[in-house]
Amino acid sequence: MNTSNLDITKKSSVNQRNKERITYLMIKQKIKLLWNKAQMDAFNSNNYIIIKFFKKYTYFLNLILKDNDINSYRTQLKTSFILNSKLTISLLFILIFVGVEASSILFKEIYNQRAASKYFKKLNIQFNNFQYIGYINHLTYKSVPSFLNKEQRIISELFFPKKYGAFSNKKIWDELNCYKINKFNEYITIDPLWLFSNKKKYNLINKKKLNSLSNKTTKIILYESENEEEVNDKNSKENKSLLMDEKSISSSNNIKVKRFDLLIDSEKKDRQLLKVSFQKDDNFSFINNKIFGYYYQQLNNYLNIKKEIILAIEKLIFYSIKKKKVNLWVKNEAPLEYQGQPLKLINNRSLKASYLINKLTDRSNEKIAVTSKQNKFYFKKSPLEAQRFKNKKKFFIASFWQRFRSFLKETPYYFDYTNRIFSKKKFELLSLNKKKISPKDQTQNQEGYSIYLDKSHDIIPFEQINLNNPLGTKGVIYNIKSNNKKYYNLFNYRSRPFVIHAGIKKYLRRKKKNSYFRRRKINNISSNTLLKLKKSYTQNLKMPVFLNPNQWGFYYSKSLKKNIKNRELISPLVNLPIAHQREYLYNSKYLPFVFTNLENYNVYLPNLNKNLQNKVNSDILLKSYTYLPKSVKNKKKYTSVFFNLLKQKIILPDKLINYYQDGNYLKFYFFVSWFLLIELFSILAFMQIFISIFYILRKSIGEIIIELMHEVSGHLNNVTEDLKSWLPEYFFKEPFEWQFFEASTKSFENFAEKENLKRFFDPYILALQYTKSNLRLPFFNIKLDINILQKPIKSYKKFKSIVLSNNEKEELLIKPILLVGPPGTGKTLLVRAIAGEADIPVIQFIVNKDSPGFTRELVPEYEKLSKAFEYAKSIAPCILFFDEMDSLAPKRGGGYFGENAWAEIRLNNNILPYEFSPLKAPEPQKNKMDKFKTKKVKPRGTLLQLLYECNNLSNEKPILLIGATNRQNEIDPAVIRPGRFSTIYNFSLPNSSERIDFCKFYAAGLSMDKEIPWDYIAKRTVGFSPSDISMLMKESSLYGVLNNTKHTLKSLEHGIDRVLGVSKSYLSTLNISKKNVYNKILHMAYYKVGLTLLPLLFKQEMPAFIKLWPMQERAIVKQNKLEENIHSSEWDTLATLEQKLILRYGGKAAELLFSYLDKDLSDEGFSELSAGQLFITFLVDYYNHYSRSEPLGIIPTLLKKRSSTFWHNYEYNLFEFKNIINGPSNVYKEPLIGFYGIEGAESFYDQKDKAKDILDIKDKHAQSLNSYLWWYQYVPKDIFKIWTTSLKNQKWSRFWLPDPELSFFNLDFVNAEIYVSELIDTLLPTWKFNNQGLRKLNKKTRTVWPQIKFATHEYIVSCLILSSLNKAMEVLDEHREFLDFCVAHLIKEEILREPDILKNLKRFNLEKYHPKNNLEKDQFKDNKKLNILNKYTIVSRSGGLNSRRPFPLWIDVDTITKNN
């Protein structure tokens, strides 16, 4: 007998490696697509496929869940991920599905290169594997008949063990275990992992001893040598035999095959793959001289597997395949091009491959052309999904069949119509009741709904379906023969009917013959015969039906109806309920079965005896089946193959049996082929790869996987009671309402100030770690020194020694913690960090009263809370986290307690029996006690349950309760009393320095520009939470990667805009064609610049930036900024508050300086003016800064300061107010006091007359620009076109205005007190007095005190508004050139930043306003130099050396006095 040879491949050439790399990446991408498909099917409600498939591969869970060597992994799952095997079971649903799909791909491609290639050349890749399974069976049975005869029983019992309901069958598994050589010694496969291990440790097969074997079967045993020197010494006589026959193995008791450690030399980058080639003998058949079927003996060692081994296994599997269709990529040695750009420009080969894969799999591109110099081919949609057809007709048939089959997948008629799609026969679908109804008739169901189906209707509306009896709803099927509509009762879909699958005729037809089957009788089989057989056993079938209301029926479009009619296809125009989940006919996960229960099948198996034709239950096993085409050449081969298949019988267990009326068990024949063994090995290989990859990536995507697994478990509640027995009990816990069960991989390293967190939370962490060792909860002394806790204690042993050394042996529970702070401040992240540091799981309980949960039933909230505590105690120690604590334990209302409750309410809430209005009659107010009495009391069950659970915490099962809320005032006081959630940690928004630290903390991974103004960034991020800053830096990193830059100022501003949700849609609203659009832009620019510059000129904190176009901010950021401004104004003085009031009117003052006409003023700044009005209300009413301490409380000090001559006769007697009554005439004659403080001026009337004379003589136009300024030459000239707007018909206003020629005073200026006095005159009625005394007035003319209070209140408010606005205009006009310069910069750049403003202060001689120059330079000069200034009188100040006022105008007083 020939021996096997071990060939070590040499290093391949560069071209060959490139080919292999491309092939590897293409297949890897195909597996990725399959993985996505598996995820969609796994997390879809249609997971019935996975459940059934899970039954079939029960043995597979035996390896994962029942192996003793995997206990460490199970423990790690429990502590770090999720409860025990929940993740593993849910993961198997996906991995097995993907593994089988991928194995079917490899299975096809391997046999394409073998002897079966002559058959495969005539087939299409899309075609079902099982439609040509006979070819594979023929090859395998011919090569290894002895193997199948001997091992058929073991494989069959493996798939369908006797104890079918259990998760494992240890006996059968032991027979397949390679370590039990004495029980299972027919064949031993090779583990591919040892091919990559160290050569010195492992020995391969010895050729000499292989030749000396006397047994026919080839046995390959891996042996681990204890001494490496024995391996090196090839001629050593002590070297044990690696190959033994059956007798020697059974007789030698001392020989033990050890486990193999997966070792690999990480230093070797370019690793050579080993090829093991064997010659074909009577017992083994190796395809393409390479091993493909591998049985992984050491699957439990995947915990130690490395990433390089995973890649090596993939290479071993993938490189043994020669693709047929994908070979188009391998043959093109020339560099590929994508849309005309060669991919060779990318130097890195891995980047090049990933770039190619990403471009080819982009589904957004409908058409992608990939060209090469050697060959040109065209892909429609994605190249990985497309195929190349030489024949256009064949391509059309394939594309049509693919679209039509995808449509039929979503319908319950998938199995019923696949046999008639390409059939020439026209026949109609018959039902159990053959009663026909004319189209004009009207039918009614049980609910009384009328269904009209005439020629104008194509479908049955959803509303007309009887939900109580959906299977009894009438339907319609289109008949091609008679071209009319007929009514039939729908099928009873509780069990699947027998349907003949004749296959697709045009796919496998030969060139000369049109018939697909040899015998024409097959096509003549109608469904009526099958339905009659179905009727006999469906009556007593008690399989429950699970219906999903969201999946009722389907609809045909009219265009599809025409296409089907033209192609002579049956069109089911019905709306049917889906009573069972759909299953794929072409899926390779089902084994091939042959029907033997009907006489019609005798044409397929003519050589079978009739006594072997037992009835089969199709609902359990016959999900996918096929029939083999007959031909003259292969007729004898198939008959012999089928005869060999039907030898062994298997009896199903009681749990999965459906009974006939006579109660006999159903029996069937099970067929085993070489494909089963290959499928088993390939599944194990892919399971090894995927589990290893998930183990490596568990720290980064572990939480996402867990959440997806819980979604899978949530959908499993739709399964029937029969299927629930196959799943663990915790899948169906009621209620399962907590959000997720996890232990986070977060730690204190995720925080910037980790030392402070450790100082506070180390006692909790250490106490929880101590309880994990199943010991008693340690004593925690409150009186510990603070110095001990300042440094984090890393080991709980040290903590134990410190704590237990105290004499006070009092046990103290871990008290609950309440975290309070705004959203995004890291409350939930801190909980995960505590869990990660303590290495314990976390249960997050989220209150949602409207959530039905997984059970689809409304469960009381307090019951969910009780279940959560029970579950937490079962896995203690753990953390039970309550997010949004205010919704779980809201404050109770409905009454107050105590004897003096009403007095306390009245004093605290200022409740009066009546409410006074200043200008209205007294109106009664409702008593608030009535509201308290009528207020409904909310259910308190959840709150009481929480209080009960908090009081019953014990040391035996320690649970750390942590709550989080941003509204502490809404929580019931009983929850936060001492002993419960008494430990409160407040989280606040970061300040400016902390925001800078957060930005630098989250900027790791991408370098930063050195010239970033961090003070500017800190001001722009006012009100940002740490989560907002994290998102900001992520957006900045993405912007930098896409633009190939670092973290720059532009990238950070882009991130800020993304966080705030700023959009540039404002430009689309502007109509450029309008004449006043430029004027509108200028108004907006002046307003924003004035609002920004005025704080700088008052030496206050200015805004960080302004944008030309309006932007929107998130509500939470606005709220945080408003709260910060309110809190900062609580302790300000009156001067500071008045300054803030003036700053509110800076924008409107700058706009008035630009345009004085009322018709040109815009509505810009409404929010600021409203805020100023609110601020004045606080000053006058809340802070009471402008009222005296007299009993009346209405005499403002502002009036006394502004017009002292008016109030000189005032007395404090309340009934002597003659002067007040006659006061308005004296107000007009009071001396005028302006902003310059000029006293002794002329009266108001004289000034008014002179002003009229001046206005009549002078031009009526308002102020105009005298000349262009010096800084005009530094900005584009096009910008100043918007300044050429007409200034005609502008009149003087009553506000203070500067004169173009720098005059000191404008005669038209009207003081604020005089302007408001007119309001007083209109509000106060006229009083008439006699010399004898007062006369009683009527009610209409009677003045009450609230009216006088209102008049004076309005006077104060108006004075503050006008005075603030005039002061803002005066200050901005003094620096008008700098204002215009900033406006020009804003219009040009569309943004004006604080650093840009500060840089230009020196050019305008405004260095004193720089924030760093807090003190003026004049204060440090000598007194002698200061005296010189007294000799001069400054007329006008200097505007800077570059301005049109480079030097100040002054008068030498000494010179004038000397001349006099």
From Swiss-Prot:
Per UniProt, which keywords does this protein have? Membrane, Plastid, Transmembrane, Transmembrane helix
- InterPro entries on file: AAA+_ATPase, ATPase_AAA_core, ATPase_AAA_CS, P-loop_NTPase
The record's subcellular locations are: Plastid membrane
Show the GO MF annotations. ATP binding; ATP hydrolysis activity; ATP-dependent peptidase activity
Q: State any GO CC term.
A: plastid membrane
Transmembrane segments annotated in the record for this chain: 87-107, 674-694
Some GO term, biological process aspect, for this entry: which one? protein import into chloroplast stroma
Membrane topology of this protein: Multi-pass membrane protein
Lineage: superkingdom: Eukaryota
Q: According to its record, what is known about the domains?
A: Lacks the zinc protease domain of other FtsH proteins. Also much longer in both the N- and C-termini.
Q: Which family does it belong to?
A: Belongs to the AAA ATPase family.
Q: What is this protein called?
A: ATP-dependent zinc metalloprotease FtsH homolog
Q: Which organism is it from?
A: Helicosporidium sp. subsp. Simulium jonesii (Green alga)
The record's gene field reads ftsH
